[in-house]
Amino acid sequence: MERQVRGWTCSAAATDWLLRATGLDPYSTREKVVAELGYPGCIDEYSGLKDSRCIQRVIEQYDVRARQEWVGWERALQLARSTALILNSTSWYHFVAVRGLTEIGDLWIANSAPLYQAVGEVITRRDWDRLPGWQAIYIVND
């Protein structure tokens, strides 16, 4: 994933990646996503993303259902096996898209700020426990 230029745009980067990776919007850009999220109501340079439901709303503009859910490690792994999702930890204050699982069963992520708080392209169980308060915004597969 291309690195974020501004510190407050990780949620837009993750949403942009999800839209392009799933084919919902192959021509998406981060700037377009910032506008779709709602600048400055839902996202701005002072607070970043103010409400994860704004991501859910953007995804649902593409005629798919999305859900926001507080998740534990096992649920995150389950979602990563079955659908496209974005993760955020309230103690990490950073959003990433999930590519899937690694060969050893960790979360393989698309991270616009690699090594922020020592997390690169993988979230391990140790990272998960170290950065509590995880939520997922994901596409609901009917």
In which residue ranges do the predicted regions lie?
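Active-site nucleophile-adjacent alpha helix/oxyanion-hole segment immediately C-terminal to the catalytic cysteine
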Residues: 1-41
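Conserved active-site-adjacent core of cysteine acyl-enzyme catalytic domains
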Residues: 20-21, 32-142
